[in-house]
A protein has these predicted regions:
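Short coil/linker segments at helix-helix boundaries
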Residues: 2-56, 84-119
Length: 159
């Protein structure tokens, strides 16, 4: 969505600013550091807002599934939500200098990919001929290094 794209762009900007920072000194370096701090604060605010919206969407989709457990679209949408959340976390990981912190974020991202996988798998169980669902599953399997499953999904996706 729009919020996650904006956050991703801000991480890119932070990466570039921090690279420039190595060649700066004095007031220019301070201004650069202030800009990075401001971007990080903005990302934090937007991330909290995005998390609130995501949580609400997940709750609503789970209600749909309770009422209509064969709704493949609801499972697919949950898969998309978790896959997007993973992508945002991978962006955050890539913009994190502290290796221990980056490893924790990487673990969170992979947990979200596994949630996406479970929902995409359920969607394909309900609607096995939907190539779009298989393409999404292929992407997740590939990201998780599940190459045999990725290959099978690729065939079912008609790729």
């Amino acid at each position: 969505g729009e919020i996650t794209d904006d956050i991703s762009n801000k991480y890119d900007e932070i990466f570039n600013l921090e690279r420039e920072q190595r060649n700066l000194s004095g007031n220019a370096k301070k201004a650069n550091q202030d800009k990075v701090a401001s971007l990080r604060a903005s990302i934090e605010d937007q991330s909290q807002r995005a998390d609130q919206l995501i949580d609400r969407a997940v709750q609503e989709l789970q209600k749909v599934i309770e009422v209509k457990p064969d709704n493949s679209n609801a499972y697919n949408t949950l898969g998309i939500i978790y896959q997007n959340k993973a992508a945002a976390l991978f962006d955050k990981r890539n913009a994190t200098a502290d290796n221990d912190e980056a490893a924790k974020i990487d673990t969170q991202a992979k947990e979200n990919l596994r949630k996406a996988m479970k929902n995409y798998e359920k969607a394909t169980e309900i609607e096995p001929d939907n190539q779009s669902y298989w393409r999404s599953l292929f992407q997740v399997y590939t990201s998780l290094g599940m190459n045999e499953k990725a290959e099978a999904a690729m065939e079912k996706a008609g790729m």
